[in-house]
């Protein structure tokens, strides 16, 4: 879901060239949902193997990761851990929305309105624990580092960006800004739109507010921990309240658990237990997982596996040379 203030903050269109030579932390769950929604057949249904299991996420992880490496961008995938208890309401809302979409999809199929069915099919994107674990397994076969966050993946990715271990957080949501990520890149794992760069300092300077104020605006509008926000208050009114200095008083009165929500953003659970090193891929392991177990096309996978091997071999070789001549 994420906070919805994208229309009110400065964004800059960038190219893949602008990210050349940089490491980025990918909000894993956000990207996997994108893949489930966008990587589909013409009738709107997701890719499946012969057992009927959805494989769209594996397709996205494999080919998008290689595409980034081809552009000299090193992806570090970050996955969610245990969500804060306050997120349960948001998860319930999401489940209900998917259930409604599934009913409408089935109704459209009965009427043989396949265009309408495809529209609703994209909203029925269930990401199972098995899919997530398989994506992690695929990344390990590919030699790509991933991080298991103790709680929210975006919080962990933001922490890594603040430390300077990665240059930016990659996510379609804006929540990473609330965790203090210095830079957020959108549209990097999509295909239709140009990447956008959002810089936290530019946002705060443009609005003439602090990060604390930005978090308050988000809480007014609604976050994953208080979906819907404060009734009748959108960005403009929230901004006015923040600028007038009365925002906190209003929020404490209107938002249950305000202090706890604020603490989630300002003091998130994070870990330093991660590696950023690429490893040579397990070629046979990748082919076994994608082709033998999930019915991907052998020729296409083999071509990309060879490409992946060469990309990582060259990167690790260059890193060794750089270290030698330091």
UniProtKB/Swiss-Prot annotation:
Residue numbers spanned by region Interaction with PCNA: 317-325
Comment on pH dependence: Optimum pH is 6-7.
Region (N-domain): 1-98
Name of the protein described by the UniProt record: Flap endonuclease 1
Family annotation (HAMAP family): Fen
Biological process terms in GO annotation: DNA repair; DNA replication, removal of RNA primer
Upper lineage: Archaea, Methanobacteriati, Methanobacteriota, Methanomada group, Methanococci
Pfam families: XPG_I, XPG_N
């Amino acid at each position: 879901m994420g906070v919805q203030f994208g229309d009110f903050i400065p964004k800059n269109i960038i190219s893949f060239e602008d990210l050349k030579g940089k490491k980025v932390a990918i909000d894993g769950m956000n990207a996997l949902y994108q893949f489930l929604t966008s990587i589909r057949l013409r009738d709107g249904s997701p890719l499946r193997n012969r057992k009927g299991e959805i494989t769209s996420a594996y397709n996205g992880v494999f080919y998008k990761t290689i595409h980034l490496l081809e552009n000299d961008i090193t992806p570090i995938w970050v996955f969610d851990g245990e969500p804060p208890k306050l997120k349960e309401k948001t998860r319930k809302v999401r489940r209900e929305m998917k259930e409604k979409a599934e009913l409408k999809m089935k109704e459209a199929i009965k009427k043989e309105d396949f265009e309408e069915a495809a529209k609703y099919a994209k909203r029925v994107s269930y990401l199972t624990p098995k899919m997530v674990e398989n994506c992690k397994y695929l990344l390990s076969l590919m030699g790509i580092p991933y991080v298991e966050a103790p709680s929210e993946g975006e919080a962990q990715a933001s922490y890594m960006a603040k430390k300077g271990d990665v240059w930016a957080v990659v996510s379609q949501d804006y929540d990473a800004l609330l965790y203090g990520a210095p830079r957020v890149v959108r549209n990097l794992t999509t295909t239709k739109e140009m990447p956008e760069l959002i810089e936290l300092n530019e946002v705060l300077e443009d609005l003439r507010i602090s990060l604390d104020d930005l978090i308050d605006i988000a809480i007014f509008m609604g976050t994953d921990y208080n979906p819907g926000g404060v009734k009748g208050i959108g960005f403009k009114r929230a901004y006015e309240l923040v600028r007038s200095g009365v925002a906190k008083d209003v929020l404490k009165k209107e938002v249950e658990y305000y202090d706890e929500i604020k603490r989630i953003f300002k003091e998130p659970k994070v870990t330093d237990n991660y590696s950023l090193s690429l490893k040579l891929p397990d070629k046979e392991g990748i082919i076994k997982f994608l082709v033998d177990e999930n019915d991907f096309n052998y020729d296409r996978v083999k071509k990309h596996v060879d490409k992946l091997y060469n990309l990582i071999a060259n990167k690790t070789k260059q890193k060794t040379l750089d270290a030698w001549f330091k």
